[in-house]
Amino acid sequence: MIEVSHLSKSYGSRPAVQDLSFTVPDGQIYGLLGPNGAGKSTIMNILTGYLAPTEGEVKVAGFRLPEQAQQAKACVGYLPEQPPLYPEMTVEEYLLFAAELKGVKRADRKEQVRKTAHRTGLDNVMPRLIRSLSKGYRQRVGIAQALLGSPELIILDEPTVGLDPAQVVEIRKLIRELGKAHTVILSSHILSEVQAVCQQVLILSKGKLAASGTLEELTAGDRSLEEVFMELTGGNTEEETGEEEAE
């Protein structure tokens, strides 16, 4: 599904990602874990075709980025950390608009929106203005727009930041359900998030890949994920900051 080979990205003279290589096969939930500023958002933007790498090769569903960005984007549903919502629209209006932007055929839009709304638990709020929704429901709307067009790959950037505990539980449950039908990449700096939903983990530190593997592999020898993370990243978990990445 995703092949990344010797990927680097710099902003001027400042490197954000350095010589990164990894492969994501189909059908699992992958966690991209790292402290704020580790390069996660830069990688998300490259994988979704919104940012060109400085060096290296990236393929999504067999399409090379950025040369075949249009074809690759058709295979990807993306939820950025700040969902692109329009508060003056109703949920239904917004999802129909998003379906149109994604090229869903007019004859299929209402049915696809209906099914996606049901899948993401939005049935009862479809007539409501987005501005009237709780943050948890707004996040569901963001996930719903990512699912429109039936993409093979779902990319979620910090999907539970700012949610209350009950909302976090519900969104994590939804992500696990998505993993049954899609390949999912979840970017987070929250250790418990990755432990709760991910089957494979890539740990980043200062723009480099520090470790990768299953949770069982990373925590072999009775070590906790927190201990492994602190050792690899210099002890900066930043779990409670909600701070944006300085990329």
Language-model segments: residues:
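Conserved ABC transporter NBD signature motif
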Residues: 56-67, 71-72
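ABC ATPase "signature
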Residues: 212-213
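Conserved ABC ATPase "signature" region
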Residues: 96, 100, 107-125
